[in-house]
Curated annotation (Swiss-Prot):
Domain Disintegrin residue range list: 98-124
Assembly, per entry: Heterodimer; disulfide-linked.
Enzyme class: hydrolase
PROSITE patterns documented for this protein: ADAM_MEPRO (PS50215), ZINC_PROTEASE (PS00142)
GO biological-process terms attached to the record: proteolysis
Enzyme nomenclature, EC number: 3.4.24.-
Disulphide bridges, residue numbers: C114-C120, C165-C177
Names of the cofactor(s): Zn(2+)
Protein name per UniProt: Zinc metalloproteinase-disintegrin-like ammodytagin
Post-translational modifications reported in the UniProt record: The N-terminus is blocked.
A Gene Ontology molecular function term of the record: metal ion binding
Domain of life: Eukaryota
Record's GO cellular component terms: extracellular region; plasma membrane
Length: 184
């Protein structure tokens, strides 16, 4: 058994009769690419590596593992996103939620940014340009995360593809600041 599987077993034994669900955050490296592991049937426990500077990335892994604890599996090629798929966008009539914008979904095009409000994710002030070394490919979670380094700079968190990084330039999939006409 791997160190992650042994730790998960021991944690599951500890909490077996004490809680409905438990998630253990650890600073220990979980076997290279493993950022989290959870049982889908045995005991409702998860083990999550606190691996990043951003609590949002760690929270995302924890939510993923909690989904496994609740019996959810990964979507596969056969899933065409009916209601049972995790990637399915819920209809406004199917959920209870606060007020939303537009057609109820955030659908920003590459390079789009919002300023604030309930439709904003990773909010930035309008017209803000990030430093070229902050380009970050959201699809590369778990690799070298780039964040602002100076305490004088605002914290932009992750900077996704298409974010303006200089005049006429945007972040591309190689985390480089390139001419907007050659980025895609």
């Amino acid at each position: 058994k791997s160190a992650a599987x042994v730790t998960l077993d021991l944690f599951g034994d500890w909490r077996a009769k004490r809680h409905d669900n438990a998630q253990l955050l650890t600073g220990i490296n979980l076997n290279g690419q493993t950022l989290g592991i959870a049982f889908m049937s045995k005991x409702s426990v998860g083990l999550i590596q606190d691996y990043x500077k951003s609590y949002l990335l760690v929270a995302s892994v924890m939510a993923h593992e909690l989904g496994h604890n609740l019996g959810m599996e990964h979507d596969d090629g056969n899933c065409i996103c009916p209601a049972k798929c995790i990637d399915n966008k819920p209809l406004r009539t199917d959920i209870v939620s606060p007020a939303v914008c537009g057609n109820y979904f955030v659908e920003l095009t590459p390079g789009s940014q919002c300023a604030d409000g309930v439709c904003c994710d990773q909010c930035r002030k309008a017209g803000v340009t990030v430093a070229p070394d902050l380009c970050f490919d959201y699809n590369q979670l778990g690799t070298e995360d780039k964040f602002t380094h100076s305490p004088d700079d605002p914290d932009y968190g992750m900077v996704d593809l298409g974010t303006k990084c200089a005049d006429g330039k945007v972040c591309n999939s190689n985390r480089q600041c390139v001419d907007v006409n050659t980025a895609y």
